[in-house]
């Protein structure tokens, strides 16, 4: 059995981030510009090609305009 670093909870985490981005009517390009990263950065974490660390998550939450603590509470619910 192969182990994956991408658990069901991590998949939910990325799906919630995508939903938050879409709720704020931000495209991947617009978010990438706010992050000062290429669009492929956003695409890769949204598609599970790369994993985010906590600092990256906090930067993304800031740029999307969401409260990181509230987001984590929703993820834990």
Segments predicted by a language model, with ranges:
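DNA major-groove recognition helix of helix-turn-helix/homeodomain DNA-binding modules
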Residues: 55-70
């Amino acid at each position: 059995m192969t182990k994956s670093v991408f658990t069901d909870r991590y998949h939910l985490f990325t799906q919630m981030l995508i939903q938050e981005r879409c709720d704020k009517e931000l495209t991947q390009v617009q978010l990438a510009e706010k992050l000062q990263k290429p669009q492929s950065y956003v695409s890769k974490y949204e598609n599970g090609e790369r994993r985010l660390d906590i600092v990256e998550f906090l930067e993304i939450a800031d740029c999307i305009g969401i409260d990181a603590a509230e987001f984590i509470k929703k993820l834990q619910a």
